[in-house]
Amino acid sequence: MGDNHGDDKNIEIWKIKKLIKSLEAARGNGTSMISLIMPPRDQVSRVTKMLGDEYGTASNIKSRVNRQSVLGAITSAQQRLKLYNRVPPNGLVLYTGTIVNDEGKEKKVTIDFEPFKPINNTLYLCDNKFHTEALNELLESDDKFGFIVMDGNGTLFGTLSGNTREVLHKFSVDLPKKHGRGGQSALRFARLRMEKRHNYVRKTAELATQYYINPATSQPNVSGLILAGSADFKTELSQSDMFDPRLAAKILNVVDVSYGGENGFNQAIELSSEILANVKFIQEKRLIGKYFEEISQDTGKYVFGVEDTLNALDSGAVETLIVWENLDINRYVLKNSTTGETVIKHLNKEQEANTENFKVDNNDLDVEDKMSLLEWLANECKRFGCALEFVTNKSQEGSQFCRGFGGVGGILRYQLDMTAFDEDLDVYDDDESE
């Protein structure tokens, strides 16, 4: 799994979270809201037949209003299913029905999509709300973690993903024991012992690169690494120059275990369970910690605030874009009703309520397009060539980033003089006012 795949997954997970939120908030009158989930390898014909049977049953509902809305929902589900010859490889999720919006008006909605990973649930429910419990399975982490269990008898390389553990490779080693005798030869024995130890650490480091670095992307194929073992081999490995720096950056924990081999692997998993459960939290702290470090060292390789960040994105300077996952800012494309010019504005709830933001020189600005800035960034980040990371405000660092930096910022590839953008804008404003 390269970084690119990781970014895509971040965006997919954010989209599902957003969808769950809006589906959970939706309410309807009567039981006119259908939740339908089909796992991979299910048959479209089976569900079509079931919906036909449901239609027959619903025709007997006594209340005319309720009957019509239920039949309407079943019909729109049938229509949408006609677009699929077969169930997509990851399954199919369909929500359809009549919801009541904030103004009390009824509105028909239909949402259908193939999840970004297989969904193993079958669901059909007709209710006054959409059922999203099954979608939570898509949010569960399927991150893969690497384990290196190293002691005086040999090394084991393994991975853990969810509850599935796999042994990739193990090898034994015969290291000479410390000698009490030897007289003149004691130094020679010590030197041989050190040499064999050194070779053992080197072999382990080389195999670690072989098993945990994806040759296609040159990036680690695991989300984190746990080094385990008895004695100090694991520490020696983590501090060794021979250990690949790309993997060293992924070390989450170094643990002491009483055994080597598979028993040690099981023990290491047990001892690391808390860290693995909080890995998203740890990654977030590290990411924002790196961002704060750029600021405290005043490297000039950072940017914060919506406008500065977007300017830096435009110039291709942003390496990692960091955004709060609940950022409540909309991107407006506005058209001057008199001159026909378009402007883009980014407004929060408070600014949206101020009509002055929709005027320029007493001319009204018409809304051509309105979109959540988060959604726009998720769709466009590929074009800017940057990695997009969503953060929460649950960690101390995350909370500080959201409160102090407006929830939008970036780590830059190179220094950028942000004042140059302001000067360009000033020149532009002067031209406007003349």
Swiss-Prot record:
SMART domains: eRF1_1 (SM01194). Pfam families: eRF1_1, eRF1_2, eRF1_3. GO terms for cellular component: cytoplasm. The keyword Glycoprotein does not apply. It comes from the Eukaryota. Its main location: cytoplasm. Keywords: Cytoplasm, Growth regulation, Protein biosynthesis. Signal peptide: none annotated. It is found in: Cytoplasm. GO terms for molecular function: translation release factor activity. Belongs to the eukaryotic release factor 1 family. Directs the termination of nascent peptide synthesis (translation) in response to the termination codons UAA, UAG and UGA. Modulates plant growth and development. PANTHER family: PEPTIDE CHAIN RELEASE FACTOR SUBUNIT 1. Heterodimer of two subunits, one of which binds GTP. This is Eukaryotic peptide chain release factor subunit 1-1. It comes from Brassica oleracea var. botrytis (Cauliflower).
